[in-house]
């Protein structure tokens, strides 16, 4: 791969995981499908923190089911490798092609998943054995 930049991910939408200043960043979300919920992520593209300069990544307008995030990252990296200008850094590429191009590359991955035996794994979060639930509680950030 020709990317040497950062990918940051947090299950929480707060900024502690610094997803918003990563070249590719994700924060946790969910997708409601009838009475069921899919663990999901919202992506940011083009963020950076270097030499005291902060650039917030642009939030994509797609929610990706958690189990489809690795494929989304692979698609974006392949897109970058094949469409970049010689020597073009990832963030410069992201700025040049725009948010919509990144959204279009993964739009089919964000399509709703109907609940069935074949799709059950999408409704279970990574390293868990039971269906995903959004559980809200008092968080550290609220103190």
Where are these predicted regions, by residue range?
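Peripheral terminal and linker regions in Fe-S/redox and tRNA-modifying enzymes
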Residues: 3-143
